[in-house]
Amino acid sequence: MRGVLIAAMVALVVSLLGTPWVIRFFRRQGYGQEIREDGPSSHLTKRGTPTMGGTVIIVATLVGYFLAHLVTGIGFTASGLLVLLVMTGLGIVGFLDDYIKIRKQRSLGLTARMKFTGQAAVALAFGLLAVRFKNHAGLLPGSTYISIVRDTSLTVGIIGFPLLAWIIIAATSNAVNLTDGLDGLAAGTSAMVFGAYVVISFWQFGNLCEPGDSPAGCYAVRDPLDVALVAAAAMGACFGFLWWNASPAKIFMGDTGSLALGGAFASIAIVSRTELLLVVLGGLFVIETLSVMIQVAFFKATKKRVFNMAPIHHHFELAEWPETTVIIRFWIVSGLAVAFGLGLFYAEFLSHGNG
């Protein structure tokens, strides 16, 4: 528990104190956000706001994680390092996307094919590595079985697992990217989901199956304490960044942050065996993504729009909701989704006769 607290506090402090320095540096370099002309007119005033703030979130998470290990003397684990690999790898893809936007002064960076290739490379590397590195109990970071709150009997096989990992990682990172359209929305929502994974992973650690000792409801997962440590560091980093990203934002996380956060969620869900539970915990990300899918499909079929604009947070902006109202209400939705997801997780544990 001490390591989890250290990781969260160190990441919070690094992010909180490091972000102003990054804001000043990016302003001097002219690293400002380009704004879509077809978006809400109120967003045009945000043009030039420093972006690529996700670099702070990633660095703060890494510092929190590694310093917590240094202080506690706990060894590094395959699961924790793989989550950080995905987070950092997708952060690099997002950084390249943001950098191209800034250099070419346009709202679009990498081509869809280039971004797809980058996401696929990171996800497939994770998928191949996650089915290696058995521990003393014979457990791997990843599992070929599809999981809800723990592994089910449905398996995709050793060949299908990298593909499954790619789908989950790509879908989640793109979902967070779509949500990152209002000041503080993605950062605040991400902090909640990471907080949920601190609880889930630490609970798994306290109820871990051990060789020769597998009480009812125990969890056959590898390295849950280290996963909790990563989630705590990421949560602290998000909260520290949110201080400066809250409306009116002094800096945006950019694709650097949104892709990295999505990758972290997906990889944590995979190593904690909660792949489908992530759909509930990240309910707001799902709603935002579905709004885009519905809008595109309906427009192609009828040439009409369901929403004023997608993702759905822009629909409410164009319906003349103040931006802060949209953000706070969406945070409430996210909080309810996280609470419901944690309730499902605990209810499943109780169903094994642990009540």
UniProtKB/Swiss-Prot annotation:
The chain crosses the membrane at residues 3-23, 56-76, 80-100, 120-140, 152-172, 185-205, 224-244, 251-271, 276-296, 330-350. It is a multi-pass membrane protein. CDD domains: GT_MraY. It is an enzyme of class 2 (transferase). The keyword rRNA-binding does not apply. Its main location: membrane. InterPro entries: Glycosyl_transferase_4 (IPR000715), PNAcMuramoyl-5peptid_Trfase (IPR003524), PNAcMuramoyl-5peptid_Trfase_CS (IPR018480). The lineage of its organism: Bacteria, Bacillati, Actinomycetota, Actinomycetes, Frankiales. It is found in: Cell membrane. Pathway: Cell wall biogenesis; peptidoglycan biosynthesis. Catalyzes the initial step of the lipid cycle reactions in the biosynthesis of the cell wall peptidoglycan: transfers peptidoglycan precursor phospho-MurNAc-pentapeptide from UDP-MurNAc-pentapeptide onto the lipid carrier undecaprenyl phosphate, yielding undecaprenyl-pyrophosphoryl-MurNAc-pentapeptide, known as lipid I. It comes from Frankia alni (strain DSM 45986 / CECT 9034 / ACN14a). Belongs to the glycosyltransferase 4 family. MraY subfamily. Pfam families: Glycos_transf_4, MraY_sig1. The keyword Transit peptide does not apply. Its EC number is 2.7.8.13. The gene is mraY. NCBIfam families: mraY. Keywords: Cell cycle, Cell division, Cell membrane, Cell shape, Cell wall biogenesis/degradation, Magnesium, Membrane, Metal-binding, Peptidoglycan synthesis, Transferase, Transmembrane, Transmembrane helix. GO terms for biological process: cell division; cell wall organization; peptidoglycan biosynthetic process; regulation of cell shape. GO terms for cellular component: plasma membrane. One of its GO terms (molecular function) is metal ion binding. This is Phospho-N-acetylmuramoyl-pentapeptide-transferase. It catalyses: UDP-N-acetyl-alpha-D-muramoyl-L-alanyl-gamma-D-glutamyl-meso-2,6-diaminopimeloyl-D-alanyl-D-alanine + di-trans,octa-cis-undecaprenyl phosphate = di-trans,octa-cis-undecaprenyl diphospho-N-acetyl-alpha-D-muramoyl-L-alanyl-D-glutamyl-meso-2,6-diaminopimeloyl-D-alanyl-D-alanine + UMP. Its cofactor is Mg(2+).
